[in-house]
Amino acid sequence: MVQITLPDGSQRQYPGPVTVAEVAQSIGAGLAKAALAGRVAFDGAEPRLVDTSFRIDNDAQLAIVTAKDADGLDLIRHSTAHLLAYAVKSLFPDAQVTIGPVIDNGFYYDFSYKRPFTPEDLQAIEKKMAELARKDEVVTREEWSRDEAVAYFKGIGEVYKAEIIASIPSNETLSLYREGDFIDLCRGPHVPSTGKLKVFKLMKVAGAYWRGDSKNEMLQRIYGTAWASKDDQDAYLHMLEEAERRDHRKIGRELDLFHFQDEAPGLIFWHPKGWALWQQVEQYMRKVYQDNGYQEVKAPQILDLTLWKKTGHWDNYRENMFTTESENRVYGLKPMNCPGHVQIFNAGLHSYRELPLRYGEFGQCHRNEPSGSLHGMMRVRGFTQDDGHIFCTEDQLQDECAAFTALLQKVYKDFGFTEVLYKVATRPEKRIGSDEIWDKAETALMESLRRTGCEFEISPGEGAFYGPKVEYTLKDAIGRHWQCGTIQVDFSMPVRLGAEYVDQNDQRRPPVMLHRAILGSLERFIGMLIENHAGAMPPWLAPLQAVVCCISEHSAEYAAQITQSLKKQGFRVQADLRGEKITRKIREHSLQKIPYLLVVGDKEMQNGTVAVRGLGGLDLGVIALDDFIARLAEDISTRRNVTQLASAA
């Protein structure tokens, strides 16, 4: 007898070995039809995903996985990647297959082919995929030896797949999945048949180096998306359209904020307007430092390699570090700021009475990211972090973490982000420090979130070897998630670099070090801001807060006077004194997403007033200049958004 325990605790008895599909069928025809895989666990072991054809020989716990489960959606996407490869091989037999993983919201598959795939090719491939899905071919799992698999794939000319398999230890049994005439290496599991794959779309083709190495052949990567329902896919495609409209690279060009060029890959050329936006963000964060007990510091850009070896960065991060040599010494361009802050801490001997000691820096970092991964301001090689480090005692951990989370929530709200997701990454199997101190650190992080009213997820084992962390993820205006802030407990670096304080018993002890950032990379955060607001920045952030437009040359001098008056008040304002029609001026400045347009003609000049238009169709009519000044000052002090006011009007 085999006893199967279901998620609701109920148990079912079977006279002998039973497959996942048979269990689903015994529960109901609807579940059997919806079943994509099973999640099975034996004798209290960790559950694992298996095919519906998986045979259960012993008592087990089993959950039937359907398209409603996150695992089910991943199965659909991974199986659709194989369906893509099947279709490509059907249409282009000379193409060679390589790898095809699941990614966020979809999948990709890399191919080697003698010519680039065209948009017409993608249409034909997608049509072929739909045809193969309609055939509802059974997907079966086969086990091969490594050498058998290498010989097979070499024999059919699949040299890339043979190379992948040859790198697997010879004593491992491999799983291959077959659907129709196509067979591919895969750990699985897969959907039981191609007919389960109903909703998918190929998105684009791009270049990708074999094994991610620029010295290797350039392959063609076909991206696709797959979903459990057409409604889900339609919502995703709509979000993509909106994301394209909001793309910070496009808006950056249109609003003359910044640009990129080939001579500086992964680096940004900031234009005056863009740098004005940057300055507002940095100055805001500088005040955050000042108001919350941080001392701003500045550490060197390059440090001798011996220091990076002491911290462990060289062993674990060297591929991402830029180096330079001078006078027979090798230096590393800093990829992060923490070692420099420890050196500043070590410059003097500190008493426990001085702790917590909080350092903050707008630290410029450089990381040698692969060229293929660079993406506007979201993934760069040179960036600035609002990086801070807190040196404290174990007893101060919880208060410091709670204060940081409360501060982070306020900062995000000020920038227009009100939805934050919280995740606590706990101790990994390989770690340093006693269980007692890990208990204290993890408890401090979780309790700090509870104290600030946060619901959070726990990611077991995802902490660093030197301490647990909290990750803070923002949700933007179109529902995308961006991981920005973090606070991480570090028991290791203070010890490695000899950081000490004198405790109340006159004993020297290493402090606990908290790595913390709210915005993360300022470049990336500004890119997020641009996309979240679709370029229409609230007045407190806008590079230009207002433009004063004269209707004719008669009112040009009055427009110039108003502009100067506003500038003296500290506002960022320009005058448009051109002899163009006022309708053209209004259109041009509206496209530049200026929060306020002040229009002045003979009537306004005679009465000492201004006609005020706000972004998003807000019309304040004709008002006194002092009233506008008061309004703009309130917008800035409250960080109010003009477009939100317009939509509420």
UniProtKB/Swiss-Prot annotation:
Keywords: Aminoacyl-tRNA synthetase, ATP-binding, Cytoplasm, Ligase, Metal-binding, Nucleotide-binding, Protein biosynthesis, RNA-binding, tRNA-binding, Zinc. The keyword Cell division does not apply. Residues 1-66 form the TGS domain. Binds 1 zinc ion per subunit. Zn(2+) binds at C338, H389, H515. It is found in: Cytoplasm. It is an enzyme of class 6 (ligase). One of its GO terms (cellular component) is cytosol. CDD domains: TGS_ThrRS (cd01667), ThrRS_anticodon (cd00860), ThrRS_core (cd00771). GO terms for biological process: threonyl-tRNA aminoacylation. The keyword Zinc applies. Its EC number is 6.1.1.3. InterPro entries: aa-tRNA-synt_IIb, aa-tRNA-synth_II, aa-tRNA-synth_II/BPL/LPL, Anticodon-bd, Anticodon-bd_dom_sf, Beta-grasp_dom_sf, TGS, TGS-like. Residues 247-538 are annotated as: Catalytic. Homodimer. Belongs to the class-II aminoacyl-tRNA synthetase family. This is Threonine--tRNA ligase. It comes from Bordetella pertussis (strain Tohama I / ATCC BAA-589 / NCTC 13251).
